[in-house]
């Protein structure tokens, strides 16, 4: 699995900011449409909002992880778009159902709002997978 370094650099320059932008716009859209979950329903304790830099750092970490997973997937051959969707859905399994089962099971919280969040994360990670495929096409990334 070898990549042309110029194409890989172009891919990362396209993909990382686009993924962070996608995550930010998605979360903003949820808040504007009032579909974002109420933090009081998700926790038993009083919940303070995370500082903005923590949220941004989390999105950057997610973007790097998604891009790395995408590169592993597309390096095995196949379509860029399929690899993008698979990378997004694999990441969603850990961010969605496994996280919900763990948090709800260990904390004894009501599962309904958590499953709603997991579904919205599935939509987000599907979009992120398509963004990865588009970035790879724009960068002319070849495995």
Model-assigned labels for residue ranges:
Residues 1-143:
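Juxtamembrane/disordered regions of integral membrane proteins
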